[in-house]
Amino acid sequence: MISKIAWELGKGTISSNKKVLAMTFSVNAAMKIKDSLKELLPELVENSEQYISKVDVANYHNFAMKLLFKHGYALNTEFINLSDFIIVDESNRVLNNYITSFDSDKLNALDDALRASDEEEMRNVIDDYWNVLNTKLIPNHVITYNGLLVSAIKLLRKRQVSSFYKEYYRMVIIDEFQDTNILGYWLVNKLIGDNTVIFLGDDIQKIYGFLGAINGIFEKYKEKYPIKEIKFCNNYRFRANECLKALDKLIRSYGNTYAPSEYEASVNLKHLANDTEEDNFIVDGIDKIINSSNDKVAVLVRAGNQGEPIADKLSRKGIQYFNALFRDTDIEFLKFYEVAIDEFHNAAGSSGKAVQKDLLNCLEAVRQRQNEIYSSARRKFVYDAMYKLLEVLFEESKKWEGTSKDRYENIDFILGSKGLKHMMEYIEEKVVLTTIHASKGLEWEYVIIPRMNAYAFPTGYMCRTCREVHSCNDGFDYCKFLFGTLMEKTFKEEISVFYVAITRAKKNVFLTVNTGLNQWNHTKQTSCLIELPGLSHNDYDWEIVI
């Protein structure tokens, strides 16, 4: 993405009064694009600063806000005061001050359709959604995150506005496009004219289907436009690692076709007797990794509770680690954001700016209110992790370009959109425990994936469904997938998660499994994911592989 933007700017294909729009999925990623361009452009052109100013970098919501700042008055004159708006999601209690339960149902109807990726239902409910925004929320300087996109789409339906931006942005380039939902899809469609539009993405890394990421979004565009498809065939991450390169190729093949693969690869798999042995083995490995090098290691789990016993053993052994095993729906997670946003606004006051003193005051105020965030000592780890991410955010924000007002808006957006987990790449701890979904976009030298058991990874939902439709060979302590016709979508969703997990490793990935007794005193079965045709196992000991 960076190279393409730099190349087009260097060639002079973007005239002086036009721009490039680069869109990504987080504020942090947007900042990194700007930084990378600043490093690369001086190698290609003189006076590189003037070229950098020709690139607008944003995520979907940031871009929507920019449109509304400039033209929102054409929809509702209150958008003139957009910088004073509170931005919330549909579940925020603030909305109860302005709307009825009937109005709330209208907002939730769109959110439900969005998560289900139901385009027809979205068309049915979007006007009702807009009416609630326009008559109840916008006049009170409140808007939802979905509402930002709905408003921007409505604005771009005005021919003068959309025509201007199709000409203004001579190139639109979007990263991680496979995670785009219907509102993002509609927004992008309004920017396509005779300009160059580039979508970058990888279908096998689409792991946010439960949030509404559109299935087969690249195929939708192939049907609609004369698309030129460019496939990247070289995996530079694993170019010096033949084992991981082969594993990448094998797992990817299961995302592309629904049949036993023609490829072969091996994976490091340790088979242990029970949960205790598995947890002890993992902790021993972590200890060896961090004491023999400066390398970092992540334990990636399918669900947060699978990592809790490992966290307990690390604590007892005195090994420092960053614990990000909480869920986005946890009370402590939600309460932290409520307190952090409140204190951030209090610290900044009415200035709409974020200076260093304000950020320090915010951190201290959040620390003083920590007892509001967690109710038991066992849940304090959520507060500790979130507080550390908030510290990292404030520290990294010093490096951002722009004014203190820009800084305020970016921090406010990250907090409001619950985006602190994107700051995990900047933490100092050499050991991280987190979920696979939270790890997307991050890398560590070593990755450990525990609990490669049926009902753990894949999830219980897939395993139960698979058995009901007879799509598995269900053995005493193993399970093999049979590629039943009704299981393709669910299977590929789990393959995508598996692929994301193994490709977080830069040097090596280690899997563990045990066939001890489960909570019902039945023997655990190994996961069908480690029994895939073409995948062989390497037993390993830490003394040999580290």
Language model feature labels by segment:
Residues 1, 19-21, 88-171, 182-184, ...:
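Accessory N-terminal region flanking or inserted into the helicase ATPase core
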Residues 1-73, 499, 503:
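P-loop NTPase Walker
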Residues 6, 186-265:
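Conserved RecA-like helicase ATPase core segment
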Residues 56-62, 143-147, 151-152, 429-436:
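Conserved two-lobed SF2 helicase motor
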Residues 169-180, 184, 203-204, 452:
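Conserved Walker B
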Residues 226-228, 233-319:
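Helicase P-loop NTPase motor core
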Residues 345-515:
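Conserved helicase C-terminal RecA-like lobe
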Residues 479-483, 489, 507, 513-546:
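Helicase C-terminal subdomain and adjacent C-terminal extension
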